[in-house]
Amino acid sequence: MSLSVRRDGAATWITLDRPDALNALDGPVKEALAGALGEAAGDPAVRAVALTGAGRAFCVGQDLRELEGGYREGRAPDFAAELERHYEPICRLLAEMPKPTVAVVNGVAAGAGLSLALACDLRLASSTSRWRLAFSGIGLVPDAGSTWHLPRLVGLSRAMEMALLGDWVDADQALAFGLVNRVWPAEDLQREAEAALAALAAGPTLAFGRTKALFRDHLGTDLTGALAGEAEAQVASGQTKDHLEGVTAFLEKRLPNFQGA
């Protein structure tokens, strides 16, 4: 199998599992990833989703060997069709599903692999992780949502540097840039990430989903629009069982037991 899925309580872990190819994305992997993400997004019992890679890489992006035959004949792939069929649905699912998504970056994240990590809500990384927006090295522009996500995370100047120069970024730099949220020693990453996923999966899932939508929607709106969107989402959140449980737990001086409802 080129991809594995496991449940850990209310969290789903999706692992890109082509370690010998550094988890490069070929057709079967992309199809399986889209299917796994769609299933997790639609399952109310899943309340947080982690994406990681097997072996020493997170993901090095598109598997160019899959396209080698066409290139040797002087034919470039149909990029519009490829992006529409595979990368756009995957990135939309990671970014827009109404529950937290977390990239657990255990090693190299490059090209479209970096784009996948950017589409997640949080990025937790190993101290040995390395990052590269590698598109310019093969004469392409960044895709799979990276031109939208990257400048919003690290700023326009830093995004331009990563895109145009194509330098490797190590874990400490990634943390300083705001590219990742937290970095741990390699031997601690899985344990710490599992704890973070468990905490997210135990949280107020509906409120998390609305928070995601508000942050993303309001990046392109004015204050008036943001205030209106917040009010609408708050009315809906205020009617949830999780809200009542949160307030009750606060008044009773105990931890809340959120059910994602």
What residues fall within each predicted segment?
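Conserved CoA-thioester-binding segment of acyl-CoA-metabolizing enzymes
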Residues: 1-54, 92
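Crotonase-fold acyl-CoA enzyme core
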Residues: 92-208, 222, 232-240, 244-248, ...
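Hydrophobic alpha-helical membrane-association signature
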Residues: 29-32, 83-86, 189, 230
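Short, charged, surface-exposed hinge/linker loops at domain edges
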Residues: 215-221
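Hydrophobic alpha-helical core bundles mediating ligand binding, dimerization, or RNAP-core interactions
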Residues: 84-91, 197, 215, 227-234
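Histidine-centered beta-alpha loop that forms part of the nucleotide-sugar donor binding/catalytic region
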Residues: 17, 62, 106
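Glycine- (often His-adjacent) and acidic-residue-rich active-site loop
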Residues: 53-93, 109, 222
